[in-house]
Amino acid sequence: MPMLIQKSEVEYQTISSTQSHLAEEQSERLHRCISKEQLEKLHEAFLNAPERQVGIDDLRVMLEDLDITFNDSMYTRLFLKINQNRDFRVDWNEFVSYLIFGFQEEDPSSQKESLILPISVPPMVRKSEHRSAICCLALLKAKSDQVPIEEVTETVNFSFGGEDSPEASGMWVTASHEGMMRFWTSHMEPIRTASSESIHLNYAFYNNGKVHSKLILGDYAGNVRILSYSPHLRGPFQAKPGAALIEVVWSDVLKGKIPQFVPKEYISLHNEMISCVYFSLHMNALFASAEYRNTKKYRGRCPGMIMVTYDERSNFRIPLGVSTFFVAESHNIVVTGGPDTFVRIWDVYIPTEPSAILTGHNGGIVLVFVQPEENKVYSVDYQKIIKVWDLQEHTLLQTYGDLVRLIHHSETDLTYYYHSHLRELVVAGRKLISIKCCPRVRVDLTDGNTHAAPVSVVLYNRLFRNIVTCGLDSYIIVWDPWTGRRKIIMKSCHTKMIYGEIIDIEITAACFDPLEQFLLTGARDGSLKIWNYNNAVVVRNMSIMPDQEVTSVIWVVDRILAMGWDRQVTEFNDVVGREYGDPKKWPKFHTDDITCADVKLGEGVVTATYSGEIIFWKLETGQPYRRYSVMDPTRFIELKLTAEEEKSLRRSKRLASRPTHTGIHGLQMSRAGRSTVTNRPEDNRDYGANIPISVQAVLFLQTRPQTLKHGSVFISLDTGYIQVYSHHQRGGYMMEFLAVHKTGDCVLTMCTDRKNRFLYTGTAFGYVKIWYIVNFCVPASEKTHVCMPKLRLEFIFLRKELFLTRAKRAIRNQPEPLLVSSYKGHLKAINSIAFINLPKIVFTGSHDYSCRLWTQGGRYLGTLGTVLPWSKLTPFERAGDDSQTYRMPPDIKKVASSTTLKVISGLQAERMVKRQEGKVTEDRDEDTAQTEDVTELKRLLDSPIKEPILGKHFELPGRTVLDQHIELDTSQSYIAVYTHLKVHSTEMLERLPTPAVIGKVQAENYLHHYVPVEGKVDISGSSLNIKQPTRRRSGKTHDPRNIRTAKARLDIGMGLSSSHASQQ
């Protein structure tokens, strides 16, 4: 009895958002305000309590003794959050668990967990267009990857599309052994081809002239040399007049004969060949690595990598040495990989021991790189396997093996390059393969995704004031709609094992318990789970029938109802002590799969099928009392099972009681074989077995009474119409209305507000429509006056326009219900829609992987999971401001109609009204306006059009008068067509003489005009040895071109000698 008294005190309405709240939100999270001393006192109070449990009043007294007070509504909500056992008694474990959950929700690391794998986009493969395999791959950029510390900006995970420009992303350069170079765009589109016979180096300049560029050289003997120079005017690499090639001797650089270079040497830094070098601008340190494969010589105590800072050296000792490494300067870490197949993570200031060792590769590591903003490490081994690791938790996230399929097994000498700006890994060999690694979100194309698959169900929890989304990716995600943060993500919620592999099952239905403390989900394989979604714990597992999809779930007091492709309602107990008993099966009156269902609390349940059947049930007894068909809704259909149905029912019960094999059982219960369960004579198929119209959604209006004149049930059909029924025993079909404006569209989901004033619908084409249903299907005595000016202020859709739009034309002859808003919210179908009463927010879950929030007027608030800043929202104030200009979703902006643009943006284009002399156009009546329009058209169209009608254009030449007839020779087995063609003999064209000036220019060589200038370059004492190009000599001295060339050289020499004489 005390338990019943406490339970009656906590009413269902205490979690409703209709309660009066304070102007500012009063926090219900104790972890923010409770101290350590207060927590110890509470622990003592729980220990002294009887059975170490306290009730709702006792806990409030304990908190008030510690000066922690709440108002009545807030404390009731707090108690329901703490009481996870639903026994209205709280122990110490429940209280501490609630505090821990509060800290977990505020953990920023939960925001970084990705919904999809790091490498989820198929790779882009192109032919290299080289005759041999690519041996070198480089990136030609206008800006270096390293920037000074003062210029480092915060890294964001989205882009506005400008990263594709050559200035930002650069160009790819590939080279092969035959001396061919090819230039590619950032998207691997060929630009040009060049050939070279010299050795190429890859170097970059710092754009900031204050920072000196460094050229780092590592040789076979283990020496590292650094050349530092100023990048101003390209430093020592600028072109010299008259010099085709400049050779620099290293000994002269060390002696300082070239002032542009500042050399520095590290002799015998390693005992083996240098494999990789890197200079960190932020840490002012040099990193150099080498491989030590001779284990007998070095015995594993070799400095695989050495970091040099000024004159200090730090040795990172790694067995077999280091083949490649990556320095993440923002995290002060370095990741190494070598022939020992291990990936090591080091702190640059602790070289004695690695922070973590990542194992899993079966071959030597050839490439490692880090994404600091994503906290991910990528490693590639010799066997072309890519592994992705979490940088903080040091766990394996993904193993990517598509390179083994794309590249031949004999091709092992590959070249890798990671583009940090585009986040692409390019693999070059005989093919060019581009792999996107955690690509940034293009906010110019999309606002991001909520799930990794279509969103199936969206719900609003009034107790915790958060949004729960379920998707076909088997994810359950809890969102805070007021900040846009993701609180909890639960992956692989429904699974099954097939041939030893665990497969995720799509979530198709979900709902909350009456007090909204737990979540019930149904999956495509017929499984049901009850979740304590605050800690991602499964409380209970259930199932309706194997391999039969659950399409709808209902949770009322002490009972759970589930229905789906098994064509009947299954009832589970929700009473303590009887929850694990056998479920109760309601009578099987449906002849096809159940697609949707809804409940009217305390009165009844309505279910609808794929064939258009509708059955009303008593909620208390589970007995049907009315049956309809949407094709003929006014016809009375008797609720009676035929002899064949009864016989089939008895047979199915006998088969269910026998132990059967899994394969045969799954075959019998599959949807493909559903016709075997409903075999009936042809004359008995009257209830919609062959009806093409299916029911997509049903909705009970909770505030309307069960009378004959109140339309309380809305039935959505796939034809685009919504039928209205009365769920009274002597009620039935009342009327229907068209709910779409496009052919082929239909309403897939519906919901209403708390007082059933507005009907919110989501269609298969992605449209959101709002209907005003206060005076729709109610007695005349209950109809109220509609204040249209007030509705026009809230819904811009109702304001008049110059032309009647398509959404309004579709319902111009439909007086009720009143369409108050219509706009395109998604590119794909809307699978679920819900409404938050107090802030007036509509949120929709779509097949395009997103869940979007809208104001009731149609303004776009945001997409859950977006990378953009979130709008300021509160659960106690109405969302939206008429003075604010709202943005549009990028994907909708490209396809939006004028109505969608007006509704989402909240702006209406000014009507251009033509004024005439002495009167205003708006005041004209309809007849006068029609007469003037006809007069204007006559004035434009009655006058003859002036020639030429098409204007001046090119005229085709006329056809020849003579008709050329060709007689074909058909005497042979085939017709020699070419023998009948008239072929004219070619004539030699007269070649015009080449002017003497052009001939002279063709014979010249630009190198003949450049000779060393005395006074600027000292050939004898300088370290720069300028090689003059050898002049070509020809044996044909009588050639006039050679005579002209020799004469030109003589003239140039005389001019130079005279100029020197004048200078002296």
UniProtKB/Swiss-Prot annotation:
Keyword annotations from UniProtKB, A to Z: Repeat, WD repeat
UniProt-listed Pfam families: WD40 (PF00400)
UniProt repeat feature WD, residue ranges: 150-194, 317-356, 360-399, 450-489, 502-541, 589-629, 742-781, 825-864
SMART domains cross-referenced by the UniProt entry: WD40
InterPro entries, per the entry: EF-hand-dom_pair, Quinoprotein_ADH-like_sf, WD-EF-hand_domain, WD40/YVTN_repeat-like_dom_sf, WD40_repeat_dom_sf, WD40_rpt
Positions of disulphide bridges: none
Region (Disordered): 1022-1044
Keyword Repeat annotated: yes
Keyword Cell inner membrane assigned: no
Top-level taxon of the source organism: Eukaryota
PROSITE patterns: WD_REPEATS_1, WD_REPEATS_2, WD_REPEATS_REGION
PANTHER family according to UniProt: EF-HAND CALCIUM BINDING DOMAIN 8, WD40 REPEAT DOMAIN 95
Name of the molecule in the record: WD repeat-containing protein on Y chromosome
Gene field: WDY
